[in-house]
Structure formats: structure tokens, C-alpha cells
Amino acid sequence: WQPEKPHIEKLIFPTHSNNEQTTLSLLSGKLDWAGAFIPAIERIFVDKDPEHHHYWFRDTGYSTFLHTNNKNPDLSNVNVRKAISYAIDREQVVRVGMYNYTTPAHVTSLSGPMSKWHSPEINNKENWTAYNVEKSNELLDSAGYKWKDENQRIKADGSPLTFDIIVVSGWSDWIRSAQVISQNLKKVGIK
């Protein structure tokens, strides 16, 4: 089959449990290609040999998602979920968690070249992916979550409004993004 093409005897696909292993394999010459997040790739890889070391990272479509447990009575409230969304500074998530490799996704998740599929009236709808702490606080206030003090919101029963963010271990982009989101939520009294 395709005799004019180079003959490749074998391909090796190593598995790594974290991006540190992938980065070390890349830097030691054990990898020719990797489909993984490499922090600070310009500085640690490309700058070492700009003629031969390259990378490509989609500027859109790579999204960090929060999947909520809607069996949790607090998260089953759409206004709480919207408040959480408004409280997230996606520019900061991209800058800190994603090393500016990408851009914040559109409210539809159809960003960049995929934006051609937006319905024309979408821009007139509520943009709950916009960073808006004031709107987040309004939604939480209207949902009945009062401030216990300047740092913590409480539920009607007096218990603190808290959620756990569970994130895959070993992948610094996800971990750092979750840390940013956690810090953002503290600004609206969610711990």
C-alpha cells in the first residue's frame, strides 16, 4: 500500500499519567509528538530549537467544563448554576490555568471558526459566561443565600454554601484552572 511513502517499522504510543511525565519525555527526546498540555511550551521546548521544535494548540474549542451534580439541592437551582458561571473569570482561567494557549469559549461553546453556526439572535440572549460578580451576587441573593459575614454565604438552615471541585490529578492545566475557579467563587461567598 502506497509504496512511494516512507516505510515505518513501528509506532510507539507511551502513556503518561500526568503532563510532567509528558514534558520530561518530550524534553529528553523520547517523544516526537504529544497530544497533551505542556506548560510554558514556548520557553521550555520551542526556544531550545525554534527551527525544529514547534507546537500547535487550538485557540478555540479547548474548554474546561464544570459538570454539576444536580442531585445536590443547591446545584439543582438554575440561578445558583448561573451565579457560579457569572463568578468565573474566564480570562483569568485562560491566563493562569491555560498559559494563554486558548481563548474563553463563547456561551454556546461554539467559538472561533465554529461561531459561524451561531443563531443570529444569540447575542441578544443572556450571556451567563460573562464575568460579572455583581450579577452573580444578585442571583445568589435572590435565591436566598445570605451573607454570614463578608467571606461566606449560608443556606436557609445556616450551613455554609460550599461545593467540592473534583479534578483529574496530574494535569496542571485542569488543576490550575480549578484553583482559579475556587478563588473566583470565594469572591461571591462560595467555598
Regions found by a protein language model. Name each.
Residues W1-I44, Q179-Q183, K191:
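Ligand-site clamp/hinge motif
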Residues K5, G35-L139, A143, A156-S159, ...:
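Local pocket/hinge segments that shape ligand/substrate recognition
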Residues K10, S115, Y145-K191:
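Ligand/substrate-recognition segments at binding pockets and active sites
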Residues S17, L75, Y131, I175-R176:
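Residue-level recognition of alpha-helix initiation/capping sites
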Residues N19-Q21, S63, S172-W174:
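Flexible loop/turn segments at secondary-structure boundaries
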Residues T23, S76-V78, D173-I175:
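Short acidic, gly/pro-rich beta-turn/loop elements at beta-sheet edges
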